[in-house]
Amino acid sequence: MKYRLLAVSGLAAGLALSAAACSSSSSPSAASGPGSSASAPPAAAAAVNFGPACSAVPKSGAGSFSGMATAPVATAASANPALSTLVAAVKAAGLVDTLNSASNITVFAPDNAAFAKIPPATLKKVLADKAELTKILTYHVAGARYTPDHLASGPAIKTLEGATVMPSMMGGTYEVNNAHVVCGNVQTANATVYIIDTVLMPPSS
């Protein structure tokens, strides 16, 4: 079922969201793996965020940009109200520790509105299927930090699920497959996060 597929690709890894972009001169290749040396330097935490949804991010506290920059991705995501459904999915898949302990990753994190596009009954079923949920969530996570420049130029990015996602820029808007980036270049202690408006679907689902 189409909605089920969308839900399945619904980032278990995305749920664990994280961010920390590297400079454009050291952007990792699509084949970069977890812990790639193309990680961003500490100064990346000062990177500029972009997108219409960034204005909704809390101005202070653990859920603010500065607050999330000091926490590992899953923990940082739990402090952002717009990512509560993703966080629930990450917990259901048992990926919290995996995401928090990962080194230098990129997370394409579906926001609550993205999950709301999925029928409640379908979403509930997916959240109860750990294997399927994990497949979806890991399709939202890449094993290296990717900069906005990389997303704009379009080289495919390999995910931890095994398949690739295709980033691009259309009319000034960053996209990943069929999803729009609504708040990008969000930094966490171990990841760079791009919040998206649609749950991604692995091609094999």
Segments predicted by a language model, with ranges:
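Mature, structured domains of secreted/extracytosolic soluble proteins
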Residues: 2-205
